[in-house]
Each structure stands twice: as structure tokens, then as C-alpha cells.
Amino acid sequence: MLTTTCRRLSQALQRPHALSAVAQRCLRAPGARSYADQNEKAEQPRTFHPALLQFLVCPLSKKPLRYDASTNELINDELGIAYPIIDGVPNMIPQAARTTRQKEKQEETKQH
């Protein structure tokens, strides 16, 4: 099972433009940092790669998540929580998640 998952992840990341700056840096020798790496940080913000959604699940419900590009969050509609994505890396710590249902409840009360 782990082999299959690793193979699928590898295939997803090998698609054109799939390797982000973070992934490319991870593939280099550990500890090797260059001046070019520092310039990359200033030039391009890191973005989340949607191909990773097939491997990510909510740590609380173990259900799939959906990516909302407008808020840059991974959302669990069932529980009404959203995990932030910071520099292209999802913060999947439950304490870091925000609730989304409060907004829905406020909108419903305003309509009535």
C-alpha cells in the first residue's frame, strides 16, 4: 500500500511544472543552499499544488478535502473547518484550522 501511494505521489509530481521550488529544493543534497535559493523566495510566492489533494485528508474526520483558491485553504465541508496553506504548505494542525460554519450561520440570520 505504501509503495502504491509513493508511486502515485511520484507520478503526480513528475507532471510538467509539478515540481515547486520547495520540492526541487528537497531533491537537492541536504544542507546545500545557494544564493539563487534566496532570490527564489523573493521572486515567487509558493503555491499549493492541487495534485496533492488525492493524498491529503482531514486529520480529524479522515475525509477528503477540497481546495479553495480564493482563500488559499483546504476545506472540510462536513465539519465546517478550513486549514490554511502557508507558502504552499498546508497547515493540517487542527488547532490552526478556522471554522467556516460561523459565517454560514451569520449569513442565514441576516437573511431572516
Curated annotation (Swiss-Prot):
Looking at the record, the residues that make up the TRM112 domain are 49-95
Which Gene3D superfamilies would you find in this protein's record?
Answer: 2.20.25.10
What does the entry list under GO cellular component? endoplasmic reticulum membrane; mitochondrion
On the tree of life, the source organism's domain of life is Eukaryota
- Which UniProt keywords are present, listed alphabetically? Mitochondrion, Transit peptide
What coarse category fits the chief subcellular location reported for this protein?
mitochondrion
Q: Name one Pfam family in it.
A: Trm112p
ATP-binding as UniProt keyword: no
GO biological process terms, semicolon-separated: protein stabilization
The entry's localization annotation reads: Mitochondrion
Any idea which residues the transit peptide spans? 1-34
Q: Does the keyword 4Fe-4S apply?
A: no
Query: Which InterPro entries does this chain map to?
Result: Trm112-like
What binding partners and quaternary form does the record give? Interacts (via TRM112 domain) with NDUFAF5; the interaction is direct and stabilizes NDUFAF5 protein. Interacts with COQ5; the interaction is direct, stabilizes COQ5 protein and associates PYURF with COQ enzyme complex.
* Function (record text): In mitochondria, S-adenosylmethionine-dependent methyltransferase chaperone that supports both coenzyme Q biosynthesis, by stabilizing its components, such as COQ5, and NADH:ubiquinone oxidoreductase complex (complex I, MT-ND1) assembly, by stabilizing complex I assembly factors, such as NDUFAF5.
Please give the PANTHER family that the UniProt record associates with this protein: PROTEIN PREY, MITOCHONDRIAL, ZGC:162634
The record's family statement is: Belongs to the PREY family.
Q: Any idea what this protein is called? A: Protein preY, mitochondrial
- This protein's species is Rattus norvegicus (Rat)
